[in-house]
């Protein structure tokens, strides 16, 4: 009754694997607010909903669909590796260094989906079994021209937004 596996009468089970972009965006530091710090809870993050390919001037010819961003800002501790003296510090000097405030920084991570290409798929590998004797999962997927163009725009737009906000 199930020559292609249970629930796979159409032969589509495992095909059209989709994922989301990963590690695309930008990071920068901010020179202002040196007299400000945070105590307890940190500054809230932000969310920028999809703004590409929603009509008019937002439309792109090099990729379809759109993407958004999530991000935030924070002020870290001063790095203890700014000099050999600081790197070798211990005791009182070490404590003095690590309690100093570092730079304000901000980051934007892009998110958008990868298109459902038919040959992006997962399969069961009956030749490679797990410790319980069950087949392992094999993924075979790649990004294409649409995703490459989208990733390029994700990075460019994140950099532009951070720079216009005063980040370096």
In which residue ranges do the predicted regions lie?
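Glycine-rich loop(s) and the adjacent beta-strand/alpha-helix scaffold that form part
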Residues: 1-39
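FAD-dependent oxidoreductase catalytic-site/capping-region signature
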Residues: 30-37, 44-168
